[in-house]
A protein has these predicted regions:
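Extracellular, repeat-based ectodomains that mediate carbohydrate processing or recognition
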Residues: 1-444
Length: 444
């Protein structure tokens, strides 16, 4: 049975974007966070669904936001308290904790953590919080911070560093998780170039590291020490490409976007999109018994079911459950869409699909969202529709196993649509409002 509820009619043009977790279930309550935009500015919100009654709480405002990049991520600890990081955009990120366990109605005062963007938050062993942020000083790499269960936030160190040869814009989208042995497994994208508005993305890579001690020291999967801040040459490189691109500010031609998951044996699996061979290739990478990373395309069933579409987005929507079932939530775009330049994604054509404003009548709007599901450890995948194109779902997110409470699986999907209504009563252009929905699916 499916049920879709409207949470807000004022979601920003990036209301649910990026890889960090936005859905948290504790016992019989599900808490969700997203970003609104109003004439007064951007605001991060939270609401709670009572799974027994089906009733939603009133909207609670976590805080104002610098812009549409400054969205919130949220987890729960083992006692059920909620923890939220309110992102900045190369500006201060702040931390808040719920005043009561499993209750999003009241929060502690905001505490500055660090300047940065694109937070990824995990509740680790013993209830300690772990956070990665892109560095705010000209996008210079990735910082790791931690908050002990009963202590303040502290800076652990810089994990990833931008190469000085690439002084321009840089992005490093991370995802990480802990195994039962307390080993931290991290995947990071690299997107570096020479300029801010041109010659972007000259160097792109997806690479992996692990840490046995909460980020103090790092190593490859085979145990080779890796000095940090690290470059791909010291990491397990899963894929990499260097060269001038097809446009000045291209979307990534390869990216994991935080997609890392562990199976029951503690083996990491990384899912990434790769457009250099053909549009929308989905590749699953996993180390074998000798520690060598093996890779295979997994989108054959998707291309067979939707031959006129290609995979474009899979941002922080990949998991492996306790039964060994692999799941990925993938957004498709027609092969002939203006979002493609041949087999490569193009920024002008993607406006309105990932976020931003959508034309009032978009003849190309045909973006179904699909589940890719494997019940044989990733050997084969089946396809199941999550949303038809008519739902106009953008940036769908389901719950990730990053909290300190048992993970219920992805039984609900948070997303925003293509409303793109100008914010009323404003002279300047603060953004566009969209409807934000939560779709609850009981047949997981």
């Amino acid at each position: 049975m499916r049920r879709t509820d409207l949470l807000s009619s004022a979601g920003s043009q990036a209301a649910t974007n990026e890889a960090g977790n936005k859905v948290v279930t504790v016992d019989r309550r599900t808490h969700v966070t997203w970003q609104d935009v109003t004439p007064e500015g951007y605001f991060n919100r939270v609401r709670t669904l009572d799974l027994d009654s089906g009733a939603w709480s009133e909207i609670c405002t976590l805080g104002s936001a610098y812009d549409d990049h400054a969205r919130a991520v949220m987890v729960a600890d083992g006692d059920g308290f909620l923890h939220a990081i309110l992102s900045g955009h190369n500006t201060p990120c702040t931390y808040r904790r719920s005043l009561r366990a499993n209750d999003a109605a009241g929060w502690t005062d905001p505490v500055p953590v660090a300047d940065g963007t694109y937070p990824y938050l995990v509740c680790g062993p013993g209830g300690d919080l772990f956070l990665t942020l892109r560095n705010a000083e000209r996008w210079n790499g990735v910082e790791l911070l931690t908050k002990p269960h009963d202590g303040p936030w502290r800076h652990v160190g810089k994990v990833i560093e931008r190469l000085a040869d690439y002084p321009g814009y840089a992005a490093f989208h991370c995802g990480f998780c802990f195994g039962a042995d307390r080993v931290l497994h991290l995947v990071s994208d690299f997107y570096e170039g020479f300029g801010v508005w041109e010659e972007r993305g000259v160097h792109q890579a997806v690479a992996y590291l692990q840490s046995p001690d909460g980020g103090r020291t790092w190593r490859t999967f085979r145990g080779e020490p890796a000095a940090t801040p690290a470059r791909p040459c010291a990491m397990d490189v899963i894929c990499q490409s260097t060269g001038l691109r097809h446009e000045p500010m291209p979307p990534p031609v390869l990216a994991a976007q935080g997609n890392i998951a562990l199976d029951s044996a503690g083996v990491p699996h990384v899912l990434y999109l790769y457009h250099l061979n053909r549009a929308g290739e989905l590749i699953l990478a996993s180390p074998d018994e000798s520690g060598i990373w093996r890779q295979r395309s997994i989108d054959a069933s998707l291309r067979s079911a939707y031959p006129k579409h290609r995979a474009m987005f899979c941002r922080g929507t990949f998991t492996v459950d306790a039964d060994g079932v692999f799941r990925a939530l993938v957004t498709l775009v027609p092969a002939g869409h203006s979002g493609w330049d041949g087999h490569l994604p193009t920024r002008p054509g993607l406006r309105g699909i990932a976020g931003g404003r959508v034309p009032a009548a978009d003849p190309e709007a045909d973006n179904p969202v699909m589940w890719l599901i494997s019940r044989d450890r990733g050997a084969t995948f089946t396809v199941r529709e999550a949303f038809p194109a008519a739902a106009e779902a953008r940036s769908p997110k389901y719950e990730l196993p990053v909290s300190g409470v048992p993970w219920p699986g992805g039984r609900g999907i948070l997303y925003f649509d293509r409303t793109s209504r100008p914010v009323p009563g404003t002279r300047e252009d603060p953004g566009f409002q969209n409807r934000v929905y939560f779709c609850r699916e009981t047949a997981w």
